[in-house]
Amino acid sequence: MSTPAHELCRLGLREAGAGVAAKAISSSELVEASLARIQATDGKLGAFLAVSADRARAAARAADARAARGERRSELDGVPVAVKDLFVTKGVPTTAGSRILEGWLPPYDATVVERLEAAGAVIVGKLNMDEFAMGSSNENSAYKPCHNPWDLSRTPGGSSGGSAASVAAGQVHASLGTDTGGSIREPAAFCGVVGVKPTYGRVSRYGVVAFASSLDQVGPLAREVGDAALVLRTIAGHDPRDMTSSTRPVDDYLAPLEDGARGLRVGVPREWLSGGLDAGVEAAVRAALDTYRRLGATLVDVSLPHSKYGIGAYYLIAPAEASSNLARYDGVRFGLRAADAKGLKEMYAESRERGLGAEPKRRIMLGTYALSSGYYDAYYLRAQKVRTLIRRDFDEAFRGCDVIAGPVTPSVAFKLGERTGDPLRMYLADIFTITCNLAALPGLSVPCGLEAASGLPVGLQLVGRPFDEATLFRAARALERELGPLPAPPEP
């Protein structure tokens, strides 16, 4: 008897892959279930910007043919996934959530897309996002907002909102996002899934539309810790096409996954729990920390004294890099062009005026100002010095602990439209996640329960030493195993 489509959509990634390998289910069945789920739910969710049904069906048939021959490329072989629309995909529209790239068909695939497809994963489409990854609510998408599966009136988080919502709603078994200041971890927390921002350089950025090149990093989102670990193991590793990618060997993240929390030293930054948190979020985070203590971990008080300056430093460094990266969108080589402009300068100005949204324009202005003559030392250079101090704080903290734990966000998912008129309040949603990017460290969000008042998910953030994602997965899995999975969100 075949498995009902809705049950196929809720399978874990590894479980689905094992079913294909055992010929208990086919990749084609999984893909058809995924496509049907997208068609049935995405009118309300808005998680997808493009669905590649024909390409996905062809990949599924190829996976089924391999299974029939007893071949298996990896544990992902034949499983439907999706990627944020920031990754270039050959022949498939890539917009970065912006009108200025509407209709652009890239001539090549991003490295992470190549690696997923080489592993046999079936990419069913491209996911909604804040324009050029600039935002914390997915409301900056030039095409449509994305909605949180737990409550359609709320944000899924940003900028990888579609990546989190699609996984939480069972549209796909895993997804890829990017994280520049919390853009994987915040949506993961808001949508009740696992989201991983790896160490800077662990995953190639080749073929990723750049926002802030010293901060951007690619990572997975999944419903289970082990599934996220498997996807990261698949996409990680050196890429000669990305000069910032590390040559350090990739660990087997699944090997220590079930080692438990006993013996781990969990650092708890006093600055992260000293105010500014909603009561329900703080209660869930403290309960998760108590769970670690019961499981045999030691809680260690640590200090990150310069973390309070992280928002200020980030919103000087990231816009400065964005003002340079986004200069290429001028109507000359690709993207929107103001064909009615009279002269070259007017074409530049009109193409950017019509093609870029309010948030990219705001950040370009911030960055250009920070880099301008007479202000560079006062703003940008000082922000880089603060970045160094933040990195040193983490170095000192890790002298006495193995992982650092705390909240991902100050609140659960907020209402759509609630903060769009107040950019500063929106920026503060990333107050606990930004320092991880500034210090180039790996970070992870794992569900730690539901807020009592709202019934919405709360995420626990775990931060590790450089390239020690394996310990993060071990710690996250220990909590996941003890607390059990969250219930599925309501049907849209």
Swiss-Prot record:
Residue ranges of coiled coil: none
Matching PROSITE patterns: AMIDASES
UniProt record, GO biological process: translation
Catalytic reaction list: L-glutamyl-tRNA(Gln) + L-glutamine + ATP + H2O = L-glutaminyl-tRNA(Gln) + L-glutamate + ADP + phosphate + H(+)
Active site (record annotation): 84 (charge relay system), 159 (charge relay system), 183 (acyl-ester intermediate)
Pfam families: Amidase
Entry keywords, A to Z: ATP-binding, Ligase, Nucleotide-binding, Protein biosynthesis
EC number: 6.3.5.7
Single GO term (MF): glutaminyl-tRNA synthase (glutamine-hydrolyzing) activity
SUPFAM superfamilies per UniProt: Amidase signature (AS) enzymes
Domain of life: Bacteria
Keyword ATP-binding belongs to the record: yes
Top EC group: ligase
GO CC terms in record: glutamyl-tRNA(Gln) amidotransferase complex
Function: Allows the formation of correctly charged Gln-tRNA(Gln) through the transamidation of misacylated Glu-tRNA(Gln) in organisms which lack glutaminyl-tRNA synthetase. The reaction takes place in the presence of glutamine and ATP through an activated gamma-phospho-Glu-tRNA(Gln).
Subunit structure: Heterotrimer of A, B and C subunits.
Family according to the record: Belongs to the amidase family. GatA subfamily.
Protein's name in the database: Glutamyl-tRNA(Gln) amidotransferase subunit A
Originating species: Anaeromyxobacter dehalogenans (strain 2CP-1 / ATCC BAA-258)
